[in-house]
C-alpha cells in the first residue's frame, strides 16, 4: 500500500496516489479540486435541475435571437437588391426568384448531406421519442448544426416560400436538452436515468416554443398538447421555469439591441377595451370557428395525400431519393414566380414579411369601409406607416385580394411542406387562419357598417379581432390544440376577446378532431414512425375487447430448468430484446424477465468455466450473476383494450407479457395494439 499512496502511516489527510504526487504543483491542484468540490456541493444543494434549466432557456434564447438577427440582415439585403436593380422586368424577376432558389437548394443539399434526419419539422420525431421510442441520430450534435444552417437558409427566403421556424426550433431545443442531460449526468456523477432524461426533453420542447414567440405560458401548454397524450404535473415547473427564462432572455436581447423600448408583445394590437364585443357577436365567432374547422379538415387531408403521392409516384420518389436539391429548386421557382410582385403577387400582398402579414391582419380598422368610396393607388414600394395598403389594389377589392390570397396560399403552402428542408409549418397556418378571420370580419363590417346595436349600445365590428380568432382557430384545428388561443393572446398582448376566441377554437377543434388526424399525426403516419393511434369515443367498443382476443400467443419463454444447449438454440433462433423467465418448463409461471444482451454476455463469459461432461442449465447461468428484472407490470387475458391502450400511453411502454393464473400465455406490443384498434375502427367487410 505504501508504494501506491503518497502519505505516511497515521497522516490525517486522505491517501493520494503517487501518480498524483509526481505531477507538477500537486498541492495547488488538490486545493483547486477541493474548492471546486465544495462549490459544487453548495450550488447543487438547491437542486442541480435549476441550473441546467436556466442554461437551456438562455442558450435557446441566444440561438433564436442570433438567427433572427442574421436572417433579418439577409432579408433586408434581398429587398435592397430588388429595389436597386432598376426597372428591367427580367433583372427584377431574376433577383426575386434566384435568391430563394439558391437558398433552398443549399439548405436542402447541406442538411441532407450531413444527416437525412435534419429535414422537415422535427416535431413528429420528437413526439415519437417522448413516447419512449429510440430514434437513432435524431438528437445527435451533428444534426443540430445541419438543422441550424438549413433553417437559417430557409427563413432567409422570407415570405416567398411562406415557412416558419417553430417545429425545427423545438427539435433544436430538445437536442440541447439531451446534451445538457448528458452533461448533468457526468457532473452529478449519477447513473443514467431514463425518467429524468424524458423530463428534460419535455422541458426542452416547451422552451423551443417559448423562444420562438416569446410566449412562455402557451409554449408549455402547446408542447404538452402536441407532444404527449399524458403529462406528469411534476414536469410543469421544469417547463414553465425554463420557458420563462428563455422568453425573458429573448425579450431582453431585443431591448438591449434597441429593437424594443421595453418588454412588449411581438405583434402589437390596439383593440378598444370598453366594449370589445357584444353578445350577438359570439355567434359570429363560433361560425368563424366552424369555417376554420372545415377548412382545416381539407388542409390536413390534402397535405397528407400530397405526401403519400410523392412517396408512391415513381418520378417524384426517385427525384426525392437522388436529387433533393433539384426538387427544392423546382418548387422554389414555382413559388417565387407566383409571388413576384409585378405579376400575380401584387394581388396577395407578397411584398410583406411573415410578421408584417400578422401586423396588418390584426389591424382593428375596417379596410372595406376605409376604401369604400376610394381606391388607393398601389405604390412602387410598401409604405411602412400604411402596410395595410398592400392588401388594396386598384384592380381588385380588399375582398378579392383576401380571397385570392387564401386560394393561392392553400396549395402553395402544401407544396412548400413537401420540400425536404428544415422548416416550421405552424406560423404559415397561423397567418392563413388570420387571413380567414380577416375576410370574415371585413364581410361583417360591410354588413354592419354602424356596428351591432344591443341594449342601446353600439359595438363596432373589428376585423382584427376576427383575424385573431381565425389565427387561433385554424392553427388549433390543424394541430388539434387549444393552447393556440392563449398563444394568440400572448403574441398580440390582448386578452379582451378571450371568451369568443376560445369558443372559436373549440368549435374548430370539435370539427377537425372528428374527421381528420392532426397535422403532426398525419406526418407520423406518412413517415411510418412508431405511434399508437388514439381510441376516440366509446362507440367502437374498446371496453368490450379483451387482451385474449388480440394478444400474440407465440411466446418464447426461458425456464430455469432449461438445459444450456436449448437456451443457446433459443437465443440463436430468435431476435427479441427480452425473454420471459418462467419457473419450470411445465408450470410456465412467470417469475421475471431476462434481457437478451445480458444473457448473451453471460453465455460468453461462463462457457469457458464449465467442466467437460457437465450439463449446466439456465439456473446456473442466473446464479453466476446474469441479471434479471422483476415483472412489475403484466396483463391479464381479461384486461380490456381500452385499459391496455391507456397503460401503454401513460407509461411509454413497448411490450407487456400476458398471464393467466400466473402462467405466461402471450405478449402485447404496439403491433398488436395498432392492429386491434384498426380492426375496431375499420371492421372487415362481412363475407
From Swiss-Prot:
GO cellular component: basolateral plasma membrane; chloride channel complex; plasma membrane
Membrane topology designation: Multi-pass membrane protein
GO molecular function, one term: voltage-gated chloride channel activity
Gene3D superfamilies with a match to the protein in the record: CBS-domain, Clc chloride channel
Catalytic activity: chloride(in) = chloride(out); iodide(out) = iodide(in); nitrate(in) = nitrate(out); bromide(in) = bromide(out)
Assigned protein family: Belongs to the chloride channel (TC 2.A.49) family. CLCNKB subfamily.
Main subcellular location: membrane
Residues annotated as domain CBS: 551-609, 626-687
Tissue and organ expression note: Expressed predominantly in the kidney. Expressed in all segments of the nephron examined, including the S2 segment and the glomerulus.
Keywords: Calcium, CBS domain, Cell membrane, Chloride, Chloride channel, Glycoprotein, Ion channel, Ion transport, Membrane, Metal-binding, Repeat, Transmembrane, Transmembrane helix, Transport, Voltage-gated channel
Source organism of this protein record: Rattus norvegicus
Positions glycosylated per UniProt: 193
Annotated protein name in UniProt: Chloride channel protein ClC-Kb
Induction data: Expression is consitently weaker in the absence of BSND protein expression than it is in its presence. The half-life with BSND protein is much longer than that without it. Rapidly degraded without BSND protein, exhibiting a very short half-life of less than 1 hour.
Alphabetized PROSITE patterns for the sequence: CBS
Record's subunit section: Homodimer. Interacts with BSND.
Pfam families the UniProt entry points to: CBS, Voltage_CLC
Cytoplasmic topological domain: 1-50, 521-687
General function of this protein: Anion-selective channel permeable to small monovalent anions with ion selectivity for chloride > bromide > nitrate > iodide. Forms a homodimeric channel where each subunit has its own ion conduction pathway. May conduct double-barreled currents controlled by two types of gates, two fast gates that control each subunit independently and a slow common gate that opens and shuts off both subunits simultaneously. Assembles with the regulatory subunit BSND/Barttin for sorting at the basolateral plasma membrane domain and functional switch to the ion conducting state.
Binding-site list for chloride: 121, 426
Family annotation (InterPro entries): CBS_dom, CBS_dom_sf, Cl-channel_core, Cl_channel-K, Cl_channel_volt-gated, ClC
GO biological process: chloride transport; regulation of intracellular pH; renal absorption; renal sodium ion absorption; transepithelial chloride transport
Sites where the protein binds Ca(2+): 259, 261, 278, 281
